[in-house]
Structure formats: C-alpha cells, structure tokens
C-alpha cells in the first residue's frame, strides 16, 4: 500500500515537472530559434537603455514636447511647480467622529 502511494506520487511529480519545464525554459534565456534570440537581445538592449530613467530613443523634439505637455497639464490642474505631475496623487480623507448616542457627525 505504501509503495503504491509512493509510485503514484512519483508519477504525479514527473508529470508536473514535465509541464513546468515549458514554463521554465524561456527563463533560461537560451533561444531555440533566431527570432526568439532577436527578441531576447532587444529586451536586454531596452533594459540597458531605460536604466537611466529617461525616455528611450528620444530626441530633443520629443523631450521638448513632453515638457510642453507636462506644463500644460500642470497649468490645467493648478500645479504649484513643485508637484511631480507624473506621480499619482495621494488622497487623505479625515476620519469623521460620530457621537455613539445620536449617530450624528460632530
């Protein structure tokens, strides 16, 4: 009985290992065809270019257009010039104290 359950467990493990190999194989970064190799090369190249935190493959016209758009958005939404317009706003909602007897806000 014990040996049969062990054999059954081994079969399940072998099946799972075979299924999961298809998921793990791309993570090994070994390309099986030229197109996959080109894709991996482009991903690595993009990662290196975007490490500085700036736009990838930008020119002065694109950077000027980005600055113009950020200035327009800042003017439209009333930015004080110190607020980072690329960051999601933080909302603060104060807790309302409720009187437990009358259930009315104070």
Curated annotation (Swiss-Prot):
Coarsely, its chief localization is: mitochondrion
Listed under GO biological process in this entry are: proton motive force-driven ATP synthesis; proton transmembrane transport
**Signal peptide (residue range):** none
Tell whether Nuclease is among the UniProt keywords: no
Q: Name one GO molecular function term.
A: proton transmembrane transporter activity
One cellular component GO annotation, for this chain's record?
proton-transporting ATP synthase complex
InterPro entries assigned to the protein according to its UniProt record, in alphabetical order: ATP_synth_f6_mt, ATP_synth_f6_sf_mt
* Stored Pfam families: ATP-synt_F6
Which keywords describe this protein according to UniProt?
CF(0), Hydrogen ion transport, Ion transport, Membrane, Mitochondrion, Mitochondrion inner membrane, Transit peptide, Transport
This protein's record includes keyword Transit peptide: yes
Instruction: Give the location in the cell.
Output: Mitochondrion; Mitochondrion inner membrane
Q: How does it assemble?
A: F-type ATPases have 2 components, CF(1) - the catalytic core - and CF(0) - the membrane proton channel. CF(0) seems to have nine subunits: a, b, c, d, e, f, g, F6 and 8 (or A6L).
Q: Which family does it belong to?
A: Belongs to the eukaryotic ATPase subunit F6 family.
Explain the purpose of this protein: Mitochondrial membrane ATP synthase (F(1)F(0) ATP synthase or Complex V) produces ATP from ADP in the presence of a proton gradient across the membrane which is generated by electron transport complexes of the respiratory chain. F-type ATPases consist of two structural domains, F(1) - containing the extramembraneous catalytic core and F(0) - containing the membrane proton channel, linked together by a central stalk and a peripheral stalk. During catalysis, ATP synthesis in the catalytic domain of F(1) is coupled via a rotary mechanism of the central stalk subunits to proton translocation.
Q: Indicate what this protein is called per its UniProt record.
A: ATP synthase-coupling factor 6, mitochondrial
Q: What is the lineage of its organism?
A: Eukaryota, Metazoa, Ecdysozoa, Arthropoda, Hexapoda
Q: Which gene encodes it?
A: ATPsynCF6
């Amino acid at each position: 009985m014990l040996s049969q359950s062990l054999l059954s467990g081994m079969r399940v493990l072998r099946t799972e290992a075979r299924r999961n190999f298809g998921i793990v194989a791309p993570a090994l970064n070994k390309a099986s065809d030229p197109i996959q190799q080109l894709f991996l090369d482009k991903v690595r190249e993009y990662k290196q270019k975007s490490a500085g935190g700036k736009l990838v493959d930008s020119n002065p016209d694109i950077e000027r257009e980005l600055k113009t758009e950020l200035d327009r958005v800042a003017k439209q939404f009333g930015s004080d010039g110190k607020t980072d317009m690329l960051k999601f706003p933080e909302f603060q909602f104060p807790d309302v104290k409720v009187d437990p007897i009358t259930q009315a806000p104070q």
